[in-house]
UniProtKB/Swiss-Prot annotation:
A GO cellular component entry from the record: extracellular region
Top-level EC class: hydrolase
InterPro entries linked: Papain-like_cys_pep_sf, Peptidase_C58, Peptidase_C58_Yopt
Region: Disordered, residue numbers: 43-72
Entry keyword annotation includes Hydrolase: yes
Keyword Oxidoreductase: no
Gene name per UniProt: yopT
Species name: Yersinia enterocolitica
Protein name: Cysteine protease YopT
Family designation: Belongs to the peptidase C58 family.
Amino acid sequence: MDSIHGHYHIQLSNYSAGENLQSATLTEGVIGAHRVKVETALSHSNRQKKLSATIKHNQSSRSMLDRKLTSDGKANQRSSFTFSMIMYRMIHFVLSTRVPAVRESVANYGGNINFKFAQTKGAFLHQIIKHSDTASGVCEALCAHWIWSHAQGQSLFDQLYVGGRKGKFQIDTLYSIKQLQIDGCKADVDQDEVTLDWFKKKGISERMIERHCLLRPVDVTGTTESEGPDQLLNAILDTHGIGYGYKKIYLSGQMSAHAIAAYVNEKSGVTFFDPNFGEFHFSDKEKFRKWFTNSFWENSMYHYPLGVGQRFSVLTFDSKEV
């Protein structure tokens, strides 16, 4: 700035007084213009530096993963952007508006909220929206991991979050959830079979009962469109005389599908997990039935045939740990 002003001031000494006055006015304007340009350039440069510093600060101090790579050296899964990601984000937003109503209703029917979780919003949505095969949701994989964790006497959320509190994700668990969903979405594979294979490796097996002199897995299917959730609830709450059981529940409709899970115990009640709303506990089956029928089924919007309110399938599982 000073060197520019000095340069033009020296040139003025070669002119007469009259010319100097005219030139001085012109020069002052030129100097002013240059000063504005320089100040603008410096201001822009400073803004860029501040923005860059802020981004770096946020990336370092607000990283959502406990470390960059999994224990076996794998990075968090990502894929190229697709426009379907925008559509899924909108669907997640609509579902997320139902979270308050569902959670508030739990206490009204004698239940407790064990953990507030929703794949439809917040930091977890930010993680799954990064890959085209997980952007629509990872309910199947979440339910599988929830059953496995519960069967070990542990909490999925202690394994998913550092310290069991929302904040940083433990990348090993996050990666495992996403990868199970990705594997189930591959062409020429059956997602149910992928999950069953994963369960077997974890010591979780389908419950088998004898039918016509043959052992068959307990797989109850039915409809909910006109009958409501009664048949569905009967299948969820039936422990087949054993007194307990893990349930993986599949709901489907005209345009969508969803998985939820439960652990039913004749003595301790029902622990219910929905990836869209969290983990809830009811001390007995009747409280759970009333809540599910009178509140949850509508508040979740699962009763709409256009969504997931047409058909259901309930699989029962046992664990070596139980």
